[in-house]
């Protein structure tokens, strides 16, 4: 839970996917508050997941450096289109978003 709260804080409660920045805590039209966020793993938390790694998956599972806050479409995209979303690209997206 501690890392989840930290992730929300450092992401500003917005999707970390490049070019998105959608608020994940409220509807932008109605301003109604809710949680639309997905916490995604850069390196999968299991070997058979997207970008899974036999040596690092378990170790990185809950590391803040391995977690991204994403909207539903981008959470689905990074896991279905792994070839275009390698670890280094996701790490760079996260870095750029969190440095803003």
Regions found by a protein language model. Give the residues of each.
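Charge-rich interaction segments
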Residues: 99-100
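Short metal-coordination and nucleic-acid-contact micro-motifs, chiefly zinc-binding Cys/His arrays
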Residues: 8-16, 63-67
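Short cysteine-rich clusters marking metal-coordination/redox-active sites
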Residues: 15-20, 71
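A boundary/linker detector
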Residues: 1-12, 24
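Histidine-centered nuclease catalytic patch
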Residues: 22-67, 77-95
